[in-house]
Amino acid sequence: MEIRCKVLVCHIILLHSATVYLYSVPASQQNPESVVVSVTNISTHVGDQGFLTCESYRMVWTQDNLMDRQRVVHWDLYNSQGVYRGERLLDMFSAGEQRIYKDYNQRRISVSESAFQDGNFSLVIKDVSMIDQGLYSCNLHHHYCHLDETVRVQLNITKSERKVKIYWDGEKIVIVALVHSTVLLPCENHDHMWTDRHREEDQQVVHWDRQAPGIPHDRADRLIDMYASGERRAYGSLFLRRKMNVSNSAFSQGDFTLFIPYLTRGDEGTYSCHLHHHYCGLHERRIFYLSVSDRPKTEEPSKTNSDSAPAIDSNVVQENKVINVTIQESRLHFFQQLGYILATLLLFILLLTAVILITRKHQKRGYAYNLNKPQGKEVNMQEICLRPPDLIQYKKEELRIDYKNNILKERAEMDRVFAPKNIDLDLELRKEYCK
């Protein structure tokens, strides 16, 4: 029984050493060449300000004041016996002891104390039982480098020695172990950021390069070098060093934007921002194509000379240019115009009222007499119409007498004396009206 358990452990170690890189996620770029993560085209004008943005949160440098507690490994059990559960088994920091969460697992599960020196984070489980089967997860966290890696191992328990085996299912290692035996769940990572503690501040560097138009990348000019330790190097002339600048707090914020306060035509070219974190395995490059053009000229109206008038070409048809000028009216002018309108409207109403009154009065009096003649006293029309003496007297005056000759007729007319009579024309008109 013990011999078979030892043989099983040897098989697990051999299988893990042969297949560890099949399921381990690489923590860093083994290729020292920078990876181009972005390409940006920038077009601007002469005199503008230029901002070439280059940011990365992984380049933020924080001093390790907790004695390298920025690396941690922990093992979790995700499911057991077909029932989902998330259970933390143990964890261990690079500068501390390992912590086991359940008393049941004390002295039964463990991780090598030299895991952060040799890179072996495998979990050893003694006297396995049916409650131990499930999906195990080995989690590595590097808070300084912002790295997270996970390795999963499936553990199944059997009571038959013939079913004991180890195989790869395409996603993870599957181990079928015999009950009450000792099992090793493999998890290894030998990258230097998990095994060694270098001087991180000496391995973080950022530099800016510039290529003039037509210059290849390998002949680019270096502008600025910056280190996390605070050292800074600027290249080129004093004017160029003062003109192009990066913030002094770049490593504390992860912002390495290049600022150019006043752009000229000579600033055109290709700019490259290189970010290198050798400890964390970060190598990135961002490319900027900067083009600077002159500002468009605004045409000013030409001044005409009144003394010398240009010759008029008869073949050219002159266009009449009309300029509309709008003057904003004041509030006082508005009230003045409103007063004019109201006064005119009031005068019109008065005239209309006078005409209506005169027309009605004229209709009552009639249209047969003159309005300008003074009015007489009112006379009853029935009395006038029923006065027979006047009518008789009027008829008597119309009588004709036959005379023998004309001489006697003339004498008779001359001898006739008519009594004076007052005639009221207004009364006569009313008589005629009564007839």
UniProtKB/Swiss-Prot annotation:
Disulfide bonds join C54-C138, C187-C273. The chain crosses the membrane at residues 338-358. Residues 359-435 are cytoplasmic. Residues 23-337 are extracellular. InterPro entries: Ig-like_dom, Ig-like_dom_sf, Ig-like_fold, Ig_sub, Ig_V-set, MXRA8. One of its GO terms (cellular component) is cell surface. Glycans are attached at N41, N120, N156, N245, N324. One of its GO terms (biological process) is cell differentiation. Keywords: Cell adhesion, Cell membrane, Disulfide bond, Glycoprotein, Immunoglobulin domain, Membrane, Repeat, Signal, Transmembrane, Transmembrane helix. Residues 1-22 form the signal peptide. Residues 32-158, 156-293 form the Ig-like V-type domain. It is a single-pass type I membrane protein. Transmembrane protein which can modulate activity of various signaling pathways, probably via binding to integrin ITGAV:ITGB3. Mediates heterophilic cell-cell interactions in vitro. Homodimer in cis. Does not appear to form trans-homodimers. This is Matrix remodeling-associated protein 8.
